[in-house]
Amino acid sequence: MGKAKAERRLKDNEAQAVARTIRVSPQKLNLVAALIRGKKVDRALAELEFSRKRIAGTVRKTLESAIANAENNHDLDVDSLIVAEAFVGKSIVMKRFHARGRGRASRVEKPFAHLTIVVREVEAKGEAA
């Protein structure tokens, strides 16, 4: 139904990694994604390693995958990579019930999210061309 999504075109100096259907709410995942946006990848990995958020490990694995994609698939220099984009999308929401008193039931929603990380190679400013 509807028209097909346009495929995102990456520039020559970019690489990405996507983690789909992560069992966390998009709001909570976005808090961790905001920690690494715009930072150098080594600094972002350090931030994620010492973050106390439960989902930081999954975000770290996705960032490491984006770095590996940049190095192996796009021949980019790992030392000059920054996190250009880290965005979160909604996925499915599983609905479950929770038994309450007097024979009643209430709904429990278990949300899922998607995470996309794009890394970009930048030139060093002090370098002579």
Curated annotation (Swiss-Prot):
One Gene Ontology biological process: translation
Species whose genome carries this gene: Sinorhizobium medicae (strain WSM419) (Ensifer medicae)
One Pfam family of this chain: Ribosomal_L22
This protein's name: Large ribosomal subunit protein uL22
Keyword Metal-binding attached: no
Family named by the database record: Belongs to the universal ribosomal protein uL22 family.
Keywords: Ribonucleoprotein, Ribosomal protein, RNA-binding, rRNA-binding
Function: This protein binds specifically to 23S rRNA; its binding is stimulated by other ribosomal proteins, e.g. L4, L17, and L20. It is important during the early stages of 50S assembly. It makes multiple contacts with different domains of the 23S rRNA in the assembled 50S subunit and ribosome. The globular domain of the protein is located near the polypeptide exit tunnel on the outside of the subunit, while an extended beta-hairpin is found that lines the wall of the exit tunnel in the center of the 70S ribosome.
